[in-house]
Regions:
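Charged, low-complexity surface segments at secondary-structure and domain boundaries
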Residues: 1-4, 64-69, 108-121, 183-194
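Acidic low-complexity segments
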Residues: 2-14, 21-35, 78-166, 201-228
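Short linear motifs in intrinsically disordered
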Residues: 16, 42-50, 163-168
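N-terminal alpha-helical targeting/anchoring segments
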Residues: 33-89
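Active-site-adjacent "lid" and substrate-binding segments of diverse enzymatic cores
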Residues: 139-267
Length: 267
């Protein structure tokens, strides 16, 4: 457990003096700090840094009400009072319980091997990774790639009148690639885990599926079928030529080898 989030300290203090009729209160914060860089071909595009914090405040009397806000400078006591007022419009017949011990904690933050400080990178490191990844994708795709690479720190915290005070934080990296009508996405907990392979595999599959239909002239052809195509043919044949036996309660199996099963086309 880390120190109480700065955004929740005022709510922790306000919970010592709840408004009249308020029996319990809770405040939860979700903060995202995002650093991103964009590559367009071999050129570095725009870079950006942003931060957003959302607050969810609940208060209970006979019933429970909530307030959602991004106004971090709002008076905590007033927000709790507003949540209590909102409880009057609740359709519930009784108050909802506030979080108890072990309410939540990110799995990554629980992992003894996870060290967020070691996963954070500088803007230069992020830029170099974006340049390398974009170059690898362009070489494979054979066309210009637009790549956005971002580092996001997600911090979540909660305080309430059950003496719950929890904070957890995790860093995630995400890459978004666009090229020739293709759009792909991948994410990882460390920058080193982001590789071009998932994009290349997805790009190849989509290009194959987008191939135009070609009408073939009547004749005899030799063709190589994928395992999925073979399975689809076999399943279709099974459904077409064994349904009669299946409906009658007899075995749907064909019987002896080379014995006809309802069709002169299949033996």
């Amino acid at each position: 457990m880390k120190e109480c989030m700065r955004e929740l300290k005022a709510y922790k203090a306000a919970m010592q003096f709840l408004p009249s009729g308020c029996l319990a209160a809770e405040a939860e914060a979700e903060k995202q700090e995002k650093l991103s860089v964009e590559m367009i071909g071999s050129q570095t595009g725009p870079m950006s840094c942003s931060e957003q914090t959302e607050l969810f405040v609940r208060a209970s009397g006979q019933k429970t009400g909530m307030v959602y806000t991004q106004k971090l400078d709002a008076n905590a006591s007033d927000v709790i009072a507003q949540a209590l007022t909102n409880s009057e419009d609740s359709a519930a017949k009784k108050a909802e319980p506030m979080a108890a011990a072990d309410y939540w904690e990110m799995d990554e933050a629980k992992d003894s091997n996870y060290d967020q400080a070691k996963t954070l990178v500088s803007i230069e490191t992020l830029k170099n990774k974006a340049k390398t990844l974009a170059g690898q994708l362009e070489e494979s795709f054979g066309c210009q790639v637009r790549l956005n690479l971002s580092q996001t720190i997600l911090t979540m915290g909660i305080v309430n009148t059950n003496n719950i005070e929890e904070t957890a934080s995790v860093c995630r990296f995400a890459a978004e690639a666009a090229a020739d009508g293709y759009e792909g996405y991948a994410c990882a907990l460390t920058l080193d885990e982001l590789s071009p392979e998932p994009f290349i595999h997805d790009f190849s599959n989509r290009r194959f599926l987008d191939m135009p239909t070609i009408l073939a002239e009547p004749g005899v052809y030799r063709a190589v079928l994928s395992s999925q195509a073979v399975n689809n043919i076999l399943i279709t044949a099974w459904q077409m030529f064994t349904a009669k036996r299946a409906r009658s309660g007899a075995t749907p199996l064909a019987g002896k080898e080379n014995k006809k099963i309802f069709s002169d086309c299949i033996t």
